[in-house]
Amino acid sequence: MNKDKIRVALADDQPLVREGFRYVINAQTDMTVSGEAGDGHDIIALAKQTKPDVILMDVQMPRCSGIEAAKDIMSALPNTKIVILTTFDTEEYVFEGIRAGAVGYLLKDTLPEELIDAIRAAARGEAIFRTVTAAKIISETFRAKQQTHAEELAEPFTKRELEVLQQMAYGLRNEDIAEKLFVSESTVKTHVHRILQKCNAQDRTQAVVFAIRNGIVQ
């Protein structure tokens, strides 16, 4: 197996769902399915044994939920990227997924090309929250008063930094953010750098999760 490929583990209690994901992922030249599990306990054991780059995690599974499994895996393997993939587009699952350390939240009816893009983005350390509910939560979070998390910041976000941070939460890259906000890519890079400094984050995902969490915990 090519070590340069993104190693993806699948966690879903429905064999047909795993088969579909496996087919789509293994058809790519830059990624491969490194293992599969049908319940929460098995994906925890599999992850600790094989250390995949990305895990596609169903929420509702036997013996241990995807959320609980994600918490366990993230405590042992903080560099593993977990994407919650489910049929349930609810605020509860979005919140719980974020708290568990997931970097993404997608629906199972996501188009194959969007799924592949999300896996690549997760492997790069980017956050992907593209469901209607996740987008709504993120938008509400960034409309909230900055006092919500001001005490934890070295200095408050500027209006433009909040706009950039919101686009980061949608999974957009610097060039896409620049086009959307009508600024140069170098300007976006400067904003991203300042955002990471202000929330003491090592990467984009940490910055996004910090912002969302501080909008949730009022």
Swiss-Prot record:
DNA-binding region: 174-193
SUPFAM superfamilies (UniProt xref): C-terminal effector domain of the bipartite response regulators (SSF46894), CheY-like (SSF52172)
Domain HTH luxR-type residue range list: 150-215
GO biological process annotation, one example: phosphorelay signal transduction system
Compartments in which it is found: Cytoplasm
Annotated keywords: Cytoplasm, DNA-binding, Phosphoprotein, Transcription, Transcription regulation, Two-component regulatory system
Keyword Phosphoprotein set for record: yes
Keyword Iron-sulfur: no
TM ranges: none
4-aspartylphosphate found at: 58
Boundaries of every Response regulatory domain copy: 7-123
GO molecular function: DNA binding
Superkingdom assignment: Bacteria
One Gene Ontology cellular component: cytoplasm
Post-translational modification, as annotated: Phosphorylated by YxjM.
PANTHER family: TRANSCRIPTIONAL REGULATORY PROTEIN NARL-RELATED, TWO-COMPONENT RESPONSE REGULATOR
Job description of the protein: Probable member of the two-component regulatory system YxjM/YxjL.
Protein's name in the database: Uncharacterized transcriptional regulatory protein YxjL
Organism name: Bacillus subtilis (strain 168)
